[in-house]
Amino acid sequence: MTAKTRRLMVMAGGTGGHVFPGLAVAHHLMAQGWQVRWLGTANRMEADLVPQHGIDIDFIRISGLRGKGLKAQLLAPVRIWRALRQARRIMRAWRPDVVLGMGGYVSGPGGLAAWSCGIPVVLHEQNGIAGLTNRGLAKISRKVLQAFPGAFPHADVVGNPVRDAVLALPAPEARFRDRTGPIRVLIIGGSQGARVLNQTMPAVAARLAGILTLWHQVGKGALEEVNRAYAANGETQHKVVEFIDDMAAAYAWADAVVCRAGALTVSEIAAAGLPALFVPFMHKDRQQYWNARLLEQACAAKIIEQPAFSVERVSDVLAGWDRPTLLTMAQRARAAAIPDATERVAREVAAAVRA
């Protein structure tokens, strides 16, 4: 008699910080014979990305309420109830053995639907402070996991699943051993770029002329404007692009990173073993600040919050990072990483089925 094939439904959507870790766990369990489906929304990145990975996806209609008007707020209970009913139909039709909530608005109705159908819920919080949806779902979840300490008081710290290509990078001492010349600084503001980085870094390049060489991801639609800023500062030799397809290659090239502090970015920088200057996005719960705090406490990174992110301040920090300092910081970053995060999450998913 053959063992029953186990079924996982991943609930994640909206941003790469939710979707890519979910894909990592999905592929890991699929390699062990699991069947995997996805619960998402039809108008966000998961709608196209997940099927490209050979995973079927079901959709519910749900969106966030932050920043919406009074009418949207008043209609919210109806829309949440409708999404919950849609998710329950999907759960009953496919009958997963366990669901994994990796974040995004879809996780709320999806998690409630699974719980109401008697399906165990495993919850993974990617950020250093838990959002409203996950704080609610934690109360009904079989297991709660967190990437960084402090999001939940008693949850296991398992890290964030990151791409295999990043985990495969050589150790910092091997990458940095023979490097000379200008310090290589990678500037990334996420796939959409970050205006504060685009406005500040061309002048930093001029202030530290000859000391730095930059690879700057500016985000969609900002290329012409940022190229003009570099030209106005007499710094046209730097590599300026809208989007970087191969982040592992970019991390391998870099000596240091200047970036936002999204959960997946922080985890990838630690896994790669790179010093970082973090500029957290100004969110009311300071989510990105708490993501970056662990690496700053490990003396592997520096945080400059956006109101203080000036040409002078950034230049002073980067000018103080010589090659021996960068190597020490890189080694501390990699020591703070959790490289087996994918396996840890997958084990907890499997354990929830057996419990």
From Swiss-Prot:
It is found in: Cell inner membrane. UDP-N-acetyl-alpha-D-glucosamine binds at T15, G16, G17, N127, R163, S191, I244, A263, L264, T265, V266, S267, E268, Q288. It catalyses: di-trans,octa-cis-undecaprenyl diphospho-N-acetyl-alpha-D-muramoyl-L-alanyl-D-glutamyl-meso-2,6-diaminopimeloyl-D-alanyl-D-alanine + UDP-N-acetyl-alpha-D-glucosamine = di-trans,octa-cis-undecaprenyl diphospho-[N-acetyl-alpha-D-glucosaminyl-(1->4)]-N-acetyl-alpha-D-muramoyl-L-alanyl-D-glutamyl-meso-2,6-diaminopimeloyl-D-alanyl-D-alanine + UDP + H(+). Gene3D superfamilies: Glycogen Phosphorylase B (3.40.50.2000). One of its GO terms (cellular component) is plasma membrane. GO terms for molecular function: UDP-N-acetyl-D-glucosamine:N-acetylmuramoyl-L-alanyl-D-glutamyl-meso-2,6-diaminopimelyl-D-alanyl-D-alanine-diphosphoundecaprenol 4-beta-N-acetylglucosaminlytransferase activity; undecaprenyldiphospho-muramoylpentapeptide beta-N-acetylglucosaminyltransferase activity. Its main location: membrane. Its EC number is 2.4.1.227. Pathway: Cell wall biogenesis; peptidoglycan biosynthesis. It is an enzyme of class 2 (transferase). It comes from the Bacteria. Keywords: Cell cycle, Cell division, Cell inner membrane, Cell membrane, Cell shape, Cell wall biogenesis/degradation, Glycosyltransferase, Membrane, Peptidoglycan synthesis, Transferase. The keyword Transferase applies. Signal peptide: none annotated. One of its GO terms (biological process) is cell division. It is a peripheral membrane protein. Cell wall formation. Catalyzes the transfer of a GlcNAc subunit on undecaprenyl-pyrophosphoryl-MurNAc-pentapeptide (lipid intermediate I) to form undecaprenyl-pyrophosphoryl-MurNAc-(pentapeptide)GlcNAc (lipid intermediate II). Belongs to the glycosyltransferase 28 family. MurG subfamily. This is UDP-N-acetylglucosamine--N-acetylmuramyl-(pentapeptide) pyrophosphoryl-undecaprenol N-acetylglucosamine transferase. It comes from Sodalis glossinidius (strain morsitans).
